[in-house]
């Protein structure tokens, strides 16, 4: 069996370190691409049919409304994960958990019996509620401990050996098969 990475990310206006800045590539996407280079597995992006606004504060309000209303945005596609036994799932932290797009992916995917290796990007909240929420959506999965990283560190991941070392140590603790 093999491993795959499934991630959700958002570029544009984002909270970066201590303020709002425009980023060309989302933090979680950069982290997912780095992990893919290290372990050589397939990579799938979770994309919603709706487009989130580019403006940071408005986007956070959209995310809050989705969470409060238990609204699951429709996804463009759902990857077929049958041939994978290990799934790395990456996402930003929005309102103390993963975005509802990730929740939609989790509830529509059969991840029962698979090893789930979650990771997230954030700007200070850490994993927050996402570990317990992941268990709700994947009750029959073998869920590893989360890896969490400040999102702004992903913007220079290729030039930051300390960040690379932290990621690589986490990957070593979560051996996978390709």
What are these regions (language model features)?
Residues 33-39, 73-77, 117-123, 147-152:
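Short C-terminal domain-edge/linker segments immediately following a structured domain
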